[in-house]
Swiss-Prot record:
Compartments, as annotated in UniProt: Mitochondrion inner membrane
Organism phylogeny: Eukaryota, Viridiplantae, Streptophyta, Embryophyta, Tracheophyta
Keywords, ordered alphabetically: Membrane, Mitochondrion, Mitochondrion inner membrane, Transmembrane, Transmembrane helix
Region forming the signal peptide: none
Name of the protein this chain belongs to: Mitochondrial import inner membrane translocase subunit TIM23-1
Keyword Cell membrane set for record: no
GO cellular component terms listed in the entry, alphabetical order: mitochondrial inner membrane; TIM23 mitochondrial import inner membrane translocase complex
Molecular function GO terms recorded: protein-transporting ATPase activity
Family: Belongs to the Tim17/Tim22/Tim23 family.
Subunit and partners: Component of the TIM17:23 complex at least composed of TIM23, TIM17 and TIM50. The complex interacts with the TIM44 component of the PAM complex.
Gene field: TIM23-1
Organism: Arabidopsis thaliana (Mouse-ear cress)
Length: 187
């Protein structure tokens, strides 16, 4: 039989007691409560010191959210182009078909493009962080600059330079806006 110690029932600062049936008013002995951590657990202490996602998590996050945002925006734009393509005498079924085809085509196209931009950005940002061992505004600006340049490189040097400048400015504005939002909006 297990010995009940008072320290087993006390919650330290890194754990909290979890009662799986607390909403059902089921009496349960405190020795059967679970101790859950209040912060993420890491296998290596070096991982816990870094306050950022890993390169794989960044790759998945930026690519996935980029694809989702691009698909939604493209589908929204496709709805309007589908409505514009209506002709006199179209039945309701044909109108719905035009809207669905147009929004699906635009959603796929925009989703793929923005997803690729997220993929390139995540790769460059993770590479810059690995080389410089810093994660600041300039890291995002360099990643945005590189993303724009790589994304438009096939269209020529001038197009790549313009897209790189736009990407760097956009990434810097987003990061600066995020810091301003964190400072003034207490959420």
């Amino acid at each position: 039989m297990a010995i009940n110690r008072s320290s087993d029932h006390e919650s330290d600062e890194n754990t909290r007691l979890y009662h799986p049936y607390q909403n059902y008013q089921v009496p349960i002995k405190s020795q059967y409560l679970y101790k859950l951590p209040t912060s993420p657990e890491f296998l290596f202490t070096e991982e816990s010191l870094k306050q950022r996602r890993s390169w794989g998590e960044n790759l998945t996050f930026y690519t996935g959210t980029g694809y989702l945002a691009g698909s939604v925006a493209g589908a929204s734009a496709g709805i309007f182009s589908g409505i514009k393509s209506f002709e006199n005498g179209d039945t309701t079924k044909l109108k719905i078909n035009r809207i669905l085809n147009s929004s699906g085509q635009a959603g796929r196209t925009w989703g793929n493009r923005v997803g690729i931009v997220g993929l390139i950005y995540a790769g460059i940002e993770s590479g810059v962080v690995a080389v410089t061992d810093k994660d600041d505004v300039w890291t995002s600006v360099v990643a945005g600059l590189g993303t724009g340049a790589v994304f438009r490189a096939a269209r020529g040097v001038r197009s790549a330079a313009v897209a790189g400048a736009f990407g760097g400015i956009a990434a810097g504005a987003v990061v600066a806006g995020k810091q301003v939002f964190k400072r003034y909006a207490h959420i």
